[in-house]
């Protein structure tokens, strides 16, 4: 097995480890003063039992596309169906694709991936560059993502991160006491056999209401729910016994969330630019976050932990 290329950053009282071999995924973020391990860390950088459940893997195209197909501007886009039980394409493969370093210092790293005619990405018919820029500061980890359309036609995009937090923030943390909060506006009901939107936006039940209020315990049970973000879109985890709090900020371009957890050790709080199956969902496209870039256009996104 090829050795994984890991780069360690230090700054602002934090350390981070970036796995260049697997989508420039930040697989570790630690706070030096408290010993907190903020992100769920893989037991081995190259032996991941589930590549989505460690660090903050990049998803492109994010979430599910039914049949792996959709039509935009008269062109049919076809992605491989890599989730046979749902008949969907799921999350793309950038999370397992090597990225190249373009800039580096002790507390920062920029890495990028470029697809072109000679090196296409899956069957995606566009040349593009996706750049991830990490920086550690006193207020945590900043991630700037830049996506550039290098083709001569409009390019649809669906972007997200499968950011996975450890409920046991420190060795002293009681995972069962940890509280989660997400700023949400509406739940997006899904058919739980295909995990695709049904077209309904139900009122919050007790779990969603507690999550929105910050009184929900992630260790109380497994969860898999899809939402539209609300307010500033903040996501937080709080250890009430130590007073430690993890805050996850994402800019307004990430208008959707997927909240997923095993009810024991971790919680995924996933920022996404669009709804699941955005191009085919039973909503108008302007309601699903479906977006595109014009030729040579660059869109930037910002996140912070």
Show the residue positions of the predicted features.
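Active-site/ligand-binding surface loops and adjacent short beta/alpha elements
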Residues: 78-79, 154-156, 164-251
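Acidic, contiguous internal or C-terminal segments within carbohydrate-active enzymes
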Residues: 9, 16, 20, 31, ...
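Acidic/His-leaning functional-site neighborhoods
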Residues: 14, 88-102, 174, 209-288
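Short, hydrophobic/aromatic-enriched beta-strand segments in well-ordered soluble domains
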Residues: 18, 111-113, 239, 296-305
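Extended, loop-rich substrate-binding clefts of extracytoplasmic carbohydrate-active enzymes
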Residues: 1, 10, 80-138
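Acidic-aromatic substrate-binding/catalytic surfaces of carbohydrate-active enzymes
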Residues: 17-76, 82, 267
């Amino acid at each position: 097995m090829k050795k994984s290329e890991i780069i360690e950053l230090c700054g602002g009282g934090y350390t981070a480890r970036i796995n260049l071999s697997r989508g420039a995924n930040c697989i570790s973020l630690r706070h030096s003063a408290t010993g907190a391990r903020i992100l769920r860390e893989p037991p081995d950088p190259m032996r991941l039992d589930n590549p989505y459940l460690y660090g903050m893997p990049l998803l492109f195209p994010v979430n599910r596309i039914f049949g792996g197909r959709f039509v935009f501007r008269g062109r049919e886009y076809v992605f491989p169906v890599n989730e046979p039980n749902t008949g969907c394409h799921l999350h793309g493969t950038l999370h397992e694709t090597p990225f190249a370093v373009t800039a580096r210092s002790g507390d920062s790293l920029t890495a990028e991936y470029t697809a072109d005619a000679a090196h296409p990405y899956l069957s995606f018919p566009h040349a593009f560059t996706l750049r991830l820029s990490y920086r550690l500061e006193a207020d945590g980890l900043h991630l700037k993502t830049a996506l550039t359309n290098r083709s001569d036609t409009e390019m649809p995009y669906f972007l997200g991160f499968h950011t996975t937090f450890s409920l046991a923030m420190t060795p002293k943390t009681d995972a069962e006491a940890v509280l989660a909060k997400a700023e949400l506006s509406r739940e997006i009901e899904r058919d739980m056999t295909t995990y695709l939107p049904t077209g309904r936006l139900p009122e919050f039940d007790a779990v969603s209401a507690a999550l929105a209020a910050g009184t929900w315990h992630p260790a109380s049970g497994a969860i898999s729910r899809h939402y539209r973000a609300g307010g500033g879109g903040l996501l937080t985890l709080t250890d009430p016994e130590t007073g430690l709090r993890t805050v996850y900020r994402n800019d307004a371009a990430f208008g959707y969330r997927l909240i997923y957890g095993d009810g024991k050790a971790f919680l995924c709080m996933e920022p996404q630019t669009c709804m699941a199956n955005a191009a085919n969902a039973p909503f108008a496209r302007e309601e699903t976050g479906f977006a595109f870039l014009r030729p040579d256009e660059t869109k930037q996104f910002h996140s912070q932990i």
